[in-house]
């Protein structure tokens, strides 16, 4: 992704850690992409699960927020829970999970 961004002037990413986490990529390997992002998706995820409950999430969003601050991230952030019969995305209460992440993000101290 970083190479493609370098080849296309003005191209930015919508960054969603859950897609990388699902395939087992650690947060530290995803972080270099933050500097190229203009939109960011937040939801719970873990290895093998594209979408997960807040209580089972393995993404360190406190760490991610610090990387965003360090790189001067100024883009949008959206809490993205979806309800579809695919990739276990119909096993969470989307509204409750969205509220949990909203409150978590509001409480972050950087």
Question: Where do the PLM segments sit?
Answer:
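Histidine-acidic metal/acid-base catalytic patches
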Residues: 1-14, 21-110
């Amino acid at each position: 992704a970083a190479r493609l961004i370098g080849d296309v002037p003005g191209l930015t990413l919508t960054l969603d850690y859950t897609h990388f986490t699902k395939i087992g990529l650690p947060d530290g390997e995803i972080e270099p992409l933050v500097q190229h992002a203009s939109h960011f998706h937040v939801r719970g995820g873990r290895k093998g699960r594209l979408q997960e409950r807040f209580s089972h999430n393995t993404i360190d969003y406190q760490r991610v927020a610090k990387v965003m601050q360090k790189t001067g991230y100024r883009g949008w952030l959206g809490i993205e829970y979806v309800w579809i019969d695919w990739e276990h995305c119909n096993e969470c209460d989307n509204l409750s999970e969205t509220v949990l992440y909203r409150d978590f993000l509001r409480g972050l101290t950087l």
